[in-house]
């Protein structure tokens, strides 16, 4: 899982750099640019620190996928709405799927989707300029999360079946080797 953590950190770094550059290009060097970029960079620092802490892989994975997602919502709120920023959450959903663990997807998608619904009532611009657009984005995110969860669940089941079949083959190989050894001794 360590390799997935590191790969996801690189994705976060690339996203922070990209969003910082596009923020400066969009808003110039203003107060909201500094605040927005500050949230992004603070999130990167938090995620990097957690990577080196002695905590479970599950906790690391949750911090790696949830912190950037919440940071994007905060960022969007600080720059007074950014309809493109929400799309970055599809990247964090993909990062959650890379762990190939339905538990991580579930514990990521449910609270984040609920937070997005709350954002609709705080400031719809955090998600999208229009209420209908925000609803659409949240529904698409939730549907994607459900489909990816179900796909991962199916994949986990097939992996367990393949492992069981491999174990059976290894047992059969051991029996065949013992029989061959005994026949050769006679």
Q: What positions do the PLM features span?
A:
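Short, Lys/Arg-rich, polar N-terminal cytosolic tail immediately upstream
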Residues: 1-2
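Interfacial aromatic-anchored transmembrane helix boundaries in multi-pass membrane proteins
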Residues: 74-81, 116-138
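Membrane-water interface at transmembrane helix exits
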Residues: 51, 76, 123, 152-156, ...
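Hydrophobic transmembrane alpha-helices and their membrane-interface boundaries in multi-pass
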Residues: 5-81, 88-94, 112-116
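HAMP domain helices
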Residues: 131-186
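Short hydrophobic alpha-helical segments that form membrane-spanning helices or hydrophobic packing faces
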Residues: 107-111
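Alpha-helical transmembrane segments and their helix-entry boundary regions
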Residues: 61, 97, 104-106
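A helix-boundary/kink motif common to multi-pass secondary transporters
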Residues: 56, 100-101
């Amino acid at each position: 899982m360590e390799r997935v953590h590191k790969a996801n950190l690189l994705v976060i770094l690339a996203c922070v750099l990209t969003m910082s550059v596009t923020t400066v290009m969009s808003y110039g060097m203003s107060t909201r640019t500094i605040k927005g970029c500050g949230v992004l960079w603070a999130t990167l620092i938090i995620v990097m620190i957690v990577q080196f802490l002695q905590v479970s892989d599950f906790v690391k994975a949750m911090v790696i996928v949830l912190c950037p997602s919440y940071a994007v919502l905060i960022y969007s709120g600080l720059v007074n709405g950014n309809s493109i920023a929400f799309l970055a959450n599809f990247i964090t959903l993909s990062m959650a799927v890379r762990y190939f663990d339905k538990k991580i997807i579930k514990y990521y998608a449910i609270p984040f989707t609920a937070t997005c619904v709350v954002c609709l009532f705080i400031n719809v611009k955090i998600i999208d300029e229009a209420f209908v657009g925000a609803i659409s984005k949240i529904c698409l995110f939730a549907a994607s999360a459900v489909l990816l969860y179900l796909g991962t669940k199916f994949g986990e089941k097939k992996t367990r079946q393949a492992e069981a079949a491999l174990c059976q083959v290894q047992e059969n190989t051991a029996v065949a080797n013992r029989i061959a050894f005994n026949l050769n001794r006679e």
